[in-house]
Amino acid sequence: TTGGTYSSTTGLSINASTGAITPSTSTAGTYTVVYTIAASGGCSAVSTTTTVTITTSAAATISYTGSPWCKTITTSRTVTRIGTSGGTYSALPSGLMISSMSGSIIPSSSAPGTYTVRYTIAASGGCAAVIATATVTITAAPIASISYAGSPFCQTITTGQSVTQTGTTGGVYSSSPSGLSINASTGVVTPSTSTAGTYTVS
């Protein structure tokens, strides 16, 4: 029978005439909805009930401090999560060693690169799945070797003696003990302005 009215316990946004519910303006919770047909034609009023539930949508943010991380780091890097718990972690592209449950990352077991970490909360209670993201970077450990051809050098040599360097560039040169005339940027050694002796260049 049509023509009845709808009502519910407090907190549910419901149209009394149509029974239409607006979840966005309702408070999360479980409600009893009553449809009542007034007494008429000598018949008593009739009512029927049903239950509806409004769930709170999941929400979360994630972040990692200290990125980029060098691949030499063997201790776990932990995630900071704010919001809904119970989600799972993943990363794109492949190559990042990450715990799907805790979100912890182990740089030393990861391939160098930049990754998007995803924290996914599954769809539930009529609400869509929620995904929070963060970006992390793993950098390759610098590797280099150096050598000087022709050493030992006679102290009478006035021309600079160049270094042969392989691997990562951009470093600075130094020596010990003191007494070696070396260019910190290029690694060039000048024997004539150096003190005779044996030096370690690094």
Question: Which role does the model predict for each range below?
Answer:
Residues 40-47, 124-131, 154:
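Short, exposed coil/turn segments at beta-strand boundaries within extracellular/luminal domains
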Residues 25-29, 109-113, 193-197:
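Surface-exposed, short loops/turns at beta-strand junctions within beta-sandwich domains
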Residues 46-51, 104, 130-135:
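Well-ordered beta-strand positions in beta-sheet-rich domains
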Residues 10, 41, 85, 93-95, ...:
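Solvent-exposed strand-loop boundary residues in beta-sheet-rich modules
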Residues 3-22, 90-106, 174-190:
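Low-complexity "stalk/linker" and mucin-like segments enriched in Ser/Thr/Pro/Ala/Gly
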